[in-house]
């Protein structure tokens, strides 16, 4: 089996063909500009904000005296907390 035949056999699988149909061969009008691509990017940003916000809220303490300490705890003691905080920003 050649490489070309392997590629086509993968596209005939139900999951691969569905992804190909909805992501690659998506029917769109020809008069769309490149601004059309910013919709999915905004959606990805929204999902990242929601997911990181939920994880940050698990470690945050909304009290006047403890808020700064909880942010320091997130940055220093939580595994990957610095990454969560900067991804959320």
UniProtKB/Swiss-Prot annotation:
Q: Name one Pfam family in it.
A: Cytochrome_B
Naming one, the record's GO cellular component terms include:
mitochondrial inner membrane
Query: Which InterPro entries does this one have?
Result: Cyt_b/b6_N (IPR005797), Cytb/b6-like_sf (IPR027387), Di-haem_cyt_TM (IPR016174)
Cofactor binding note: Binds 2 heme b groups non-covalently.
| SUPFAM superfamilies xrefs | Transmembrane di-heme cytochromes
Annotated heme b binding lies at 88
Where found, per UniProt? Answer: Mitochondrion inner membrane
| Membrane topology reported for the UniProt record | Multi-pass membrane protein
Q: Which GO terms describe its biological process?
A: respiratory electron transport chain
Q: Which GO terms describe its molecular function?
A: electron transfer activity; metal ion binding; oxidoreductase activity
Which keywords are on file for this protein? Electron transport, Heme, Iron, Membrane, Metal-binding, Mitochondrion, Mitochondrion inner membrane, Respiratory chain, Transmembrane, Transmembrane helix, Transport
Q: Which residues cross the membrane?
A: 38-58, 82-89
User: Record's superkingdom?
Assistant: Eukaryota
Q: What is this protein's function?
A: Component of the ubiquinol-cytochrome c reductase complex (complex III or cytochrome b-c1 complex) that is part of the mitochondrial respiratory chain. The b-c1 complex mediates electron transfer from ubiquinol to cytochrome c. Contributes to the generation of a proton gradient across the mitochondrial membrane that is then used for ATP synthesis.
The protein's matches in PANTHER family, at most eight in alphabetical order, are given as:
CYTOCHROME B
**Family listed:** Belongs to the cytochrome b family.
How does it associate, per the subunit comment?
The main subunits of complex b-c1 are: cytochrome b, cytochrome c1 and the Rieske protein.
Additional note from the record: Heme 1 (or BL or b562) is low-potential and absorbs at about 562 nm, and heme 2 (or BH or b566) is high-potential and absorbs at about 566 nm.
Q: What is this protein called?
A: Cytochrome b
Tell me what organism the protein belongs to: Brassica napus (Rape)
């Amino acid at each position: 089996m050649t490489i070309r035949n392997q590629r086509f056999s993968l596209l005939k699988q139900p999951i691969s063909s569905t992804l190909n149909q909805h992501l690659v061969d998506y029917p769109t009008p020809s008069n769309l500009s490149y601004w059309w691509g910013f919709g999915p990017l905004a959606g990805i940003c929204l999902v990242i904000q929601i997911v990181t916000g939920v994880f940050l809220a698990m470690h945050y303490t909304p009290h006047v005296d403890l808020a700064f300490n909880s942010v320091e705890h997130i940055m220093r003691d939580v595994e990957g907390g610095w990454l969560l905080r900067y991804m959320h920003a």
